[in-house]
Amino acid sequence: MKPIVGSIVALVTPMHEDGSVDYPSLRRLIDWHIAEGTDCIGVVGTTGESPTVAPEEHCEIIRVAVEHVAGRVPVMAGAGANSTREAIELSRYAKQVGADCTLQVVPYYNKPTQEGQYQHFRSIAEAVDIPVVLYNVPGRTVADMLPETVLRLAQVPGIVGLKEATGNIERACWLIKQAPKGFSIYSGDDPTAVALMLLGGHGNVSVTANVAPRAMHELCVAAMAGDAKRAAKIHLALLPLHKQLFCEPNPIPVKWALQRMGRCGGALRLPLTPLSAALQPVVEQSLRDAGLL
């Protein structure tokens, strides 16, 4: 696989009011992202409501995304689970339908040790011949993948990168410095992504890109080229948006924002509920400040 670099949208999963997946809107969002410069489409991750989509829906979303993208940009398929067997099954399907790589989150709830994490990810990489991007987000999973474990996994054939969503720039710097050639470090935290990329990171798996794909692409281009002045200008313009898209748990605010922009409906599946009325003006103002309304 050619290394994926740049703005990777952590795409929402559009839904109808009855909770069914809105595939026409998914296709329209993909077309919009590609037209706006998004470098890679990431589906069925946290922002894509992976915890509440059924296994058959999970697979169908990957299939539809790959089919509709049709090779225009890479597709990163969320295939993580807290069961190694389930993650392998999802990865096999992602490979079967032509995804470019899978995103594999640290197993959540069952709190594996560092050795358990190593064995989990190594088993996936050995079982399915599709590139694996690790995903460390201890704020959601509780278990934290330590840098030593990341570097150990970076030696496993087929494991090609890490989405580092702790927001810890010191940790990210050490990983960038010590990771082997060909192992990519991506930000998974919009507010600190510019710093990670200016320091040698390879891109950003972004929530903000859902509503500002062109700006996030341009931010990634500038930061990875070392153009700190331009990168800072774009970042500062988007800073209120980065903050307010997390005023309630993701993807609640970003789905409301997309609905407000007329891009897709804002329906969510329980236990997620619509954005609080008191916060709607705040999110709307951040969209206006970013020139998106």
Curated annotation (Swiss-Prot):
| One Gene Ontology MF term | 4-hydroxy-tetrahydrodipicolinate synthase activity
Keywords tagged on the record: Amino-acid biosynthesis, Cytoplasm, Diaminopimelate biosynthesis, Lyase, Lysine biosynthesis, Schiff base
The UniProt record lists the keyword Amino-acid biosynthesis: yes
**What does the entry give for GO biological process?**
diaminopimelate biosynthetic process; lysine biosynthetic process via diaminopimelate
| Enzyme class (EC, first level) | lyase
The lineage's top-level taxon is Bacteria
Q: In which pathway does it act?
A: Amino-acid biosynthesis; L-lysine biosynthesis via DAP pathway; (S)-tetrahydrodipicolinate from L-aspartate: step 3/4
Mind telling me which GO cellular component terms the entry cites? cytosol
UniProt-listed SMART domains = DHDPS
Q: What is its EC number?
A: 4.3.3.7
Q: Which reaction does it catalyse?
A: L-aspartate 4-semialdehyde + pyruvate = (2S,4S)-4-hydroxy-2,3,4,5-tetrahydrodipicolinate + H2O + H(+)
Q: Where are the transmembrane segments?
A: none
Q: Does the keyword Amino-acid biosynthesis apply?
A: yes
- UniProt cross-references to Gene3D superfamilies, sorted A to Z: Aldolase class I
Q: Where's the active site on this chain?
A: 135, 163
Looking up PANTHER family in the UniProt record yields:
4-HYDROXY-2-OXOGLUTARATE ALDOLASE, MITOCHONDRIAL, DIHYDRODIPICOLINATE SYNTHASE
**Similarity remark:** Belongs to the DapA family.
Q: Report the function annotation for this chain.
A: Catalyzes the condensation of (S)-aspartate-beta-semialdehyde [(S)-ASA] and pyruvate to 4-hydroxy-tetrahydrodipicolinate (HTPA).
| Quaternary context | Homotetramer; dimer of dimers.
Q: What is this protein called?
A: 4-hydroxy-tetrahydrodipicolinate synthase
Organism equals Methylibium petroleiphilum (strain ATCC BAA-1232 / LMG 22953 / PM1)
